[in-house]
Amino acid sequence: MRITTSIPGYKQIEIKLNPARKIGDLKKVACRKLGIEPDLTRLLLNGKRLREDLAVSKLKSSTAPVTLDYLWARQLLVWGSEGQRKLRTVTVLLAGAGAIGNEVSKNLAMLGVGRILIADLDQVEMSNVSRMIFFRSKDLGKNKAEVLAENIHGKYPYVETSAYRGELESMPLKLYLDSRVVVCGLDNVVSRIFLTQICRRYQIPLIDAGILGLTGRVQSYIPPDDTCPICLFPRNQYSNIVGLRNPCEARPDEPAVPSFSTSISLVSSIQAQETIKVIHGIDEYRATKQWPEKTGQPLRETLFLDLKNNRYAQMKVERNPKCIVCGKEGTARDTATRGELPLEMLYRKEPNKTIRRAANLYEKIITTYLENSHGTTKMEGYPTIRKRVRRGDYLRILSEARNGELHEAIIKLV
């Protein structure tokens, strides 16, 4: 029996199936052919839901196509099932669970991002409740990251969430390396400097944003060549700069800043869309220096918004050669080589040569570290490495060139 199935406006396919098979089997076959998830899809006939326990033969008398009512059917019209698959299989790190973090995580979850890791040290306070959609009065005193992760997953169960309640500097490096994009929703310069260092050194795209009252800014940073978010700051004023803050509650020794839900929503929406652009196009960009036409390229300049005076402008900021992060003497002036290695290769002969080839290193290896979800462990010889590593872990390798320069490489075990 041949059955026509359709995602309206996107694609229509014909499926041949034994009439004795169940409607549920039809759904599985159709979803597999279209590259969408069966558990997020319903089958409709003339607008009414089909029972999946019925036989396919029940459709013989109908000439209308069976509609696949997929959760993200409207998004397929723009980027197709392959584009949606990229979102469903990606991890995004959200640094900061305040006002921006609430809105960005909501948007990413609604778009179908598969996993969101949320990091924040702070607790929910009363002034947060009026501006942050996932915080309620009963959450007062609880950790922001944990509350946001729990409530996002509760509302959008198809999104995996996890929380890290601690300082960014203490977070295992693996959690950064696992992230396709880092979204910055931080309220202090010191943490933003650290985050930018990590993103530049390990070439992780960073979408940074800030708000002050009815003004805001958004910057997309594609390392290593872009102007980094810290290039704006004069080197001799780092200790005094607060800049455009993300409106989490101010520390006791800092003045509170004005915050409005309208500017929060606007800036966060732009930040989320920039994240989607990077997820869809970063591989193509790194290979061809072109961004996909369907989703567009991220901001190449810093976007400034002024809702009070209705002003919106992009400003090009040149790289600062004296930048504390990416400058000639910056803390992240050198970037690490990144590669992948099948885990089985470590159990073959000459693992040292195998690792060198994977890391594109031909110098003397000084130290090898294991980076996993528990943190960093120094490895003493290859027998130790073989016993300790798991698929998905990383090896961080430091090597020394003949001229004395140190090189760093990151190898993911797949």
Go through each PLM region and give its residues.
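Short loop-to-beta-strand transition segments
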Residues: P19, K28-R49
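Eukaryote-biased recognition of intrinsically disordered, low-complexity regulatory segments
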Residues: M1-K16
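Eukaryotic mixed-charge, acidic/polar low-complexity intrinsically disordered regions
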Residues: G47-D69, I385-R388
